[in-house]
Amino acid sequence: DAVVTEEMFTWFWEKEMAPFDRIERFFRLIRGDSTSSYIEPADFNPYLQELLKYHPGLEFLHTTPEFQEKYAKTVIARIFYSTDRMFSWRLSLRDLRRSSPSVVDAFDLADEEEDINLIFDFFSYEHFYVLYCKFWELDTDRDGFIDADDLLRYGGHALTRMTVERVIQGHGRPLRVPGTK
């Protein structure tokens, strides 16, 4: 086990944290590569693993690792959907500063609030579960993807084929999975 001495912590704090405001501190802690100008989806994983392990509102998930993974991916997707204005699956410091709802405030609230469902921005398990159930309902072949035929069933077949085709083609927000071009 690694040990952090007082001297190491003081050096780190004075160099990496003290000169910066809380949003830049968050950015500097979350990004995986200290030379990177961006936070990428995987950079959130260690923090979400700790949240899943220690948050009292998520204790019930300890016995279901498959739902822990789905919950974490959904939280990350919700963060990027609302914050990543370029749809690049990368968040700059500027994106973080402009985020509305505030990603930093949501993480602060997750640290303070015991009822995870009261954290409506990104972390609510109830919100995740509604999304998951809708996805499960549409993904009838259980391949983990929603194709055009699956999407046509949404809302009792409320979407036209032309609308669904435009969505599948990436009109509006691009349909990209992190790590792909």
Residue ranges and their predicted role:
Residues 76, 89-96, 104-111, 115-152:
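Core solenoid repeat modules with strong leucine/isoleucine-rich periodicity
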Residues 4-17, 38-65, 91-106, 115, ...:
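Amphipathic regulatory helices of Ca2+-sensor modules
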Residues 1-13, 21-41, 62-90, 127-143, ...:
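Primarily EF-hand calcium-binding motifs
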